[in-house]
Amino acid sequence: MNKKLNKKMKIDRRVTYYLMIDTETANTQLIDGKLWMNDAQVYDVGFAIVDRYGRVYVRFSVVVTEVFDGMADLMESAYYANKIPQYHAQLANGSRVRMTLMQVRRLILSLMEEYNVRAVIAHNARFDWNALNVTQRYVTKSQYRHFFPYGTEIWDTMKMAKDVFADRPTYKRFCEKHGYMTKHKTPRPQLTAEVLYRYLTNNPEFVEAHTGLEDVEIETQIFVACMAAHKKMRRKLWED
């Protein structure tokens, strides 16, 4: 366990626990002006056990060694390759740890069992779900195809936020004021984690770190805000 990150809190069986997760990837390609991420390889996984009020019970920041160390050329394609020196410094000081992808998976699944996790949550969860599956299939030569076991409930805070915030007048005004509208024929408020967190903190200058655990921390606050709204909303990744 990464002692710089974790002071494990006692498990309370009356509490419902969730696993928040975020990934950063290499092998993203720009095709026709759009980022193609279907072959993305995960090099950074941040995850935390949280409750609906944002209390953090355990958290990890992990560099996936097969990609970060074993695919040096590929890492140059990472969307945020300029952060690579930062990763090396944090690995040296212990604020991040190296693991193989299968070690990451075993750790996550053991935490999910230990805390009886209700759901795995990510912002734009389809991307993280897909990237973890793609990477696992690559490093195991398809011996293991799915990162999360069949039946794992996946929630998407982007979908939740769309139902909670997209039509909220104060959110729409905030996005219009600061230029956070989509480029659709009829512009709509953006629902990126960065913009949502700017709204929640009333800080339009906030810049998302785009590193796994740091993004988990802001996405946890988006989850908390959605739950606190007590509004009917879609949660599951595959829910229409």
Model-based region annotation:
Residues F127-W155:
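Substrate-recognition/cap helix-loop segment adjacent to the acidic, metal-dependent catalytic center
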Residues K3, K8-N133:
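Conserved non-catalytic scaffold segment of RNase H-like nuclease domains
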Residues M112, L132, Q136, A161, ...:
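Hydrophobic residues within well-ordered, non-membrane alpha-helices that form the packing/core
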Residues T28-L30, K162, Q221:
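Conserved protein kinase catalytic core
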Residues W155-T182:
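Short alpha-helix plus adjacent loop in nuclease-associated cores
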